[in-house]
């Protein structure tokens, strides 16, 4: 059965119309909240400081992911499953790259390599490269999913698309995504430690507050990657791995994961303001850094 068509899968029906309707209501709420965030970042804050430009791209990627889940429920067509599955893969890689970009920008500001951190053009290049790389990875995954028609699930479940046409392909997908998340965790830890070391090497009176904020932001992102990696690894290592939809993949993951993304956005809004105030209240800043460029970079830490 492992490599058979979905038509021969003997899956337990898990469709729940009430849960499905509630899920779509929540998806509408997430999209509405995302629009509010975009309005705040663009119209109220004018993308300044530049952290809000980063978060705008992050919000757009999140909105695409939510729309992908909605489309998977209601759109029909031969290539629907391939397209929506690829969009999901694209969003995972793209959103992770944006978070790593934020951490890299933060480190460059402290390091003083780029005066004031990345400029708008640098951010645009990074986002464009991330978008292109994410698209290539999604397309490669799409080529290994199998026959597009066999990805259509012929049942009453809410889960309208299979992840692949064979268990071996599905396991490879799970392993790749797990390894990708682990790599993101490692890179996040490296950038966080380098940033914290640089801040602690100064004589800022509020340096421990700043490091605490940096650590909090990194912890939230690492926690999200750990949750994804552990869930995917658990599935990949199952001896009886099946293509059949589960309650976790159908309801729990799609409808609860947006909560963590909204939480990340709120944390960044709060911590950015808190960190900026801590920098401004540090009276010894001009004596703690070695150059005017680093002074300016520190005030623009967020």
UniProtKB/Swiss-Prot annotation:
Residues 1-20, 72-81, 144-173, 230-249 are extracellular. It is found in: Host cell membrane; Host endoplasmic reticulum membrane. The chain crosses the membrane at residues 21-41, 51-71, 82-102, 123-143, 174-194, 209-229, 250-270. One of its GO terms (molecular function) is G protein-coupled receptor activity. Keywords: G-protein coupled receptor, Host cell membrane, Host endoplasmic reticulum, Host membrane, Membrane, Receptor, Transducer, Transmembrane, Transmembrane helix. Its main location: host cell. GO terms for cellular component: host cell endoplasmic reticulum membrane; host cell plasma membrane; membrane. Residues 42-50, 103-122, 195-208, 271-302 are cytoplasmic. Acts as a viral G-protein coupled receptor that constitutively activates host alphai-type G-proteins, thereby inhibiting host forskolin-triggered CREB activation. Belongs to the G-protein coupled receptor 1 family. This is G-protein coupled receptor A5. The gene is A5.
């Amino acid at each position: 059965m492992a490599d058979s068509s979905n038509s021969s899968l003997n899956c337990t029906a898990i469709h729940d119309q009430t849960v499905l309707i509630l899920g779509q209501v929540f998806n509408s709420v997430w999209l509405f909240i995302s629009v509010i965030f975009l309005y705040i970042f663009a119209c109220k804050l004018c993308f300044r400081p530049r952290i809000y430009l980063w978060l705008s791209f992050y919000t757009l990627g999140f909105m695409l992911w939510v729309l992908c889940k909605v489309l998977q429920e209601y759109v029909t067509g031969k290539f629907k499953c391939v397209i929506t599955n690829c969009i999901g893969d694209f969003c995972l890689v793209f959103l992770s790259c944006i978070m790593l970009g934020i951490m890299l920008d933060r480190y460059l500001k402290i390091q003083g390599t780029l005066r004031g951190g990345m400029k708008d053009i640098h951010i645009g290049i990074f986002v464009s490269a991330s978008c292109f790389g994410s698209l290539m990875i999604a397309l490669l995954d799409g080529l290994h999913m199998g026959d597009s028609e066999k990805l259509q699930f012929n049942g009453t479940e809410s889960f309208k698309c299979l992840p692949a046409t064979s268990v071996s392909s599905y396991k490879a997908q799970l392993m790749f995504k797990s390894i990708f998340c682990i790599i993101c965790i490692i890179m996040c830890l490296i950038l966080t430690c380098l940033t914290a070391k640089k801040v602690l090497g100064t004589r800022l009176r509020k340096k421990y507050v700043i490091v605490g904020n940096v650590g909090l932001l990194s912890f939230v992102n690492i926690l999200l990657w750990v949750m994804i990696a552990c869930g995917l690894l658990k599935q990949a290592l199952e001896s009886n791995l099946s293509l059949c939809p589960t309650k976790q993949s159908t309801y729990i993951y799609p409808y609860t994961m947006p909560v963590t993304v909204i939480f990340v956005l709120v944390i960044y809004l709060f911590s950015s303001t808190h960190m900026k105030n801590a920098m401004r209240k540090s009276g010894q800043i001009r004596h703690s850094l070695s150059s005017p460029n680093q002074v300016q970079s520190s005030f623009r830490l967020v």
